[in-house]
Amino acid sequence: MSSTATVTESTHFFPNEPQGPSIKTETIPGPKGKAAAEEMSKYHDISAVKFPVDYEKSIGNYLVDLDGNVLLDVYSQIATIPIGYNNPTLLKAAKSDEVATILMNRPALGNYPPKEWARVAYEGAIKYAPKGQKYVYFQMSGSDANEIAYKLAMLHHFNNKPRPTGDYTAEENESCLNNAAPGSPEVAVLSFRHSFHGRLFGSLSTTRSKPVHKLGMPAFPWPQADFPALKYPLEEHVEENAKEEQRCIDQVEQILTNHHCPVVACIIEPIQSEGGDNHASPDFFHKLQATLKKHDVKFIVDEVQTGVGSTGTLWAHEQWNLPYPPDMVTFSKKFQAAGIFYHDLALRPHAYQHFNTWMGDPFRAVQSRYILQEIQDKDLLNNVKSVGDFLYAGLEELARKHPGKINNLRGKGKGTFIAWDCESPAARDKFCADMRINGVNIGGCGVAAIRLRPMLVFQKHHAQILLKKIDELI
């Protein structure tokens, strides 16, 4: 992505945002927040609510709650806010006739797309697609995008079976209505231990991160391979980590060779996020792609959380420099729109094999256009790289200053997509709670990890505030 502006340290993307956190209550939520949550509980499940937010007052990198507490947000709504709260560009776009028309006349895109849909799809998705990707299916969420990616791989496998007349057989047509073969064949999708790909029936079967996501739910008996468990610092464990990655590739080979039914797709995150911010080297992904190609298995890269700039490139997998583009790349979160990029028209099934009423949300496609243009205009990828380097160096210093508190620091050279392990799950949870009451909204992942997910407008002065708070509270 080319840039049209150069950001200096004196440039503030949000000149009117607070100078820093400000806490007015002894707890978060405070009295007003607790009262609002109680009112919500009459109609809405609040069991996972952290605190209600005043989104009218929130700005830039700062959340404001109902009691007037101001928090530096380095979790950004589970990595979904790309360019700040109440971004002026987005607010202006929201008041445009284009957005008003599309919001108030939401189309069933599969049947009745608006006249400008080709332009919207190009400007809001394809223009910023990963290298080599040419087409897009819009969906409603990251889970949905992954689910449909599996479906496209399965339908490609099924539709390309040789048949005497070229059309589906009577037995296939009849048996599928009874959830039976040959019309409903047994096929599988390979995923990796500690992965997270969503909570729908197919995507949940490939999610392997936490029991709470899966307990009580039926699941497809699909295979999983180990994701590399790298040792840190990376430069001190080169040989061990290479052996670990090869072990995982050998496991993939074994599964694809011996699984009892065809494995039609393999899905993987560039960095396992919910599962603990687990990394692997570009060499691992090169070997994985080669292994999948050998067995004619579709390669799906889940960029739902890693996509749209947090790693310093628009798409994390582009840092691997693969010889071929992945078969599919799924996206959501910071993109705001959700969907699947692909480059082979053969993945398009017959009409109505993949279909739903909405087939995406045209408003979100328009919103993504403004977001991605803002990323380019404000040179936010370079901002993420430079701030990420500064932040990582600061965390290295704190790790030396506080031995045993910041373990397995990872994400060097990956923008602000940084994480570390606390001593225990309890220590991690306490740290997150302490940071919140001291003005920083931060999140965890995996067993005992802290993951940083600031916005792309997170700057050096924000990083200095964050490092100071970590130093005080770790």
UniProtKB/Swiss-Prot annotation:
Segments of skewed composition (Polar residues): 1-13
Biological function: Required for the degradation of gamma-aminobutyric acid (GABA), which is important for utilization of GABA as nitrogen source. Deaminates GABA to succinate-semialdehyde, which in turn is converted to succinate by the succinate semialdehyde dehydrogenase. Cannot transaminate beta-alanine (BAL).
Compartment(s): Cytoplasm
The gene coding this protein: uga1
Protein name, entry field: 4-aminobutyrate aminotransferase
GO CC, one annotated term: mitochondrion
Subunit structure: Homodimer.
Record keyword Transmembrane helix present: no
Region (Disordered): 1-31
Principal location class: cytoplasm
UniProt keyword annotations, A-Z: Aminotransferase, Cytoplasm, Pyridoxal phosphate, Transferase
E.C. number(s) listed in UniProt: 2.6.1.19
Residues reported in the UniProt entry to bind pyridoxal 5'-phosphate: 142-143, 357
Catalytic activity of the protein: 4-aminobutanoate + 2-oxoglutarate = succinate semialdehyde + L-glutamate
Family: Belongs to the class-III pyridoxal-phosphate-dependent aminotransferase family.
Major enzyme class: transferase
Residue numbers bearing the N6-(pyridoxal phosphate)lysine modification: 333
Protein's organism: Schizosaccharomyces pombe (strain 972 / ATCC 24843) (Fission yeast)
GO molecular function per UniProt: 4-aminobutyrate:2-oxoglutarate transaminase activity; pyridoxal phosphate binding
Single Gene Ontology BP annotation: gamma-aminobutyric acid catabolic process
SUPFAM superfamilies per the UniProt record, alphabetical: PLP-dependent transferases
Chain positions recorded as substrate binding sites: 199
Superkingdom of the organism of origin: Eukaryota
